[in-house]
Amino acid sequence: MTKSENEGGFISHLTELRKRLIHSFILLFIFFIGCYFFSEHLYGFLVEPFANAVNDSGTDRRLIFTALQETFLTYLKVSFFAAFFVTCPYILMQIWKFIAPGLYKHEKIAIVPYLVLTPILFFLGGALVYYLIMPLAIKFFLSFESTGASTGLPIQLEAKVSEYLSLVMKLIFAFGISFQLPVVLSLLARVGMVDAKFLREKRKYVVVMIFAAAALLTPPDPITQIGLAIPLLILYELSIFSVNIIEKKNKKNA
């Protein structure tokens, strides 16, 4: 193959990549506009764990904003997050269509399960945050409120619109990304970088690393830190099981 043919092939790949990125961006923008019309309802969905927790306390609550543009910008962020979440499968499909022609058949068969598993695990991480971690964390933080009997003045939460969204999205992304642990370890096992024996031997170090990562990725309270660490430990054990299966298949095919 001549130099000009190599350059032509490279340019054609760049052109195809550009086309797929543009298509993904256009779809993301369309959904972003659509989601903005429902941004108040989307934000209401995210606020529901907070609303349920504070309603259980029997006191009147509200969310405040201290900057004129704060609520507007918060709704823009909510719209973008929702649009990205909806279009993520399409974006992954575009990436797959770009790289698939350069893969062998057995490589395609090996990668497809991970493309399916990745968004599922992310969704499970986000669902864990929404339905379990957030309600427990909110109740934990609200327990530090005071009526003023021992503090002189009442201590009561006045949560900001933007800060609440930042907390929720930080937790969702932290859990969603952390839940990719089985995918990462299985891929490393397929390329021969780790094996089940190695993962078992390093288990005690991994436990320490998981709790350290949970402390860095979550707010400084034991509820969310333990809530992230325990599922990760379970996923690590499932990863060892998955790597065992991969090793048996590799030996069988060898």
Task: Write out the residue ranges for each language-model feature.
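Membrane topogenic/interface segments and analogous intrinsically disordered interaction regions
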Residues: 1-254
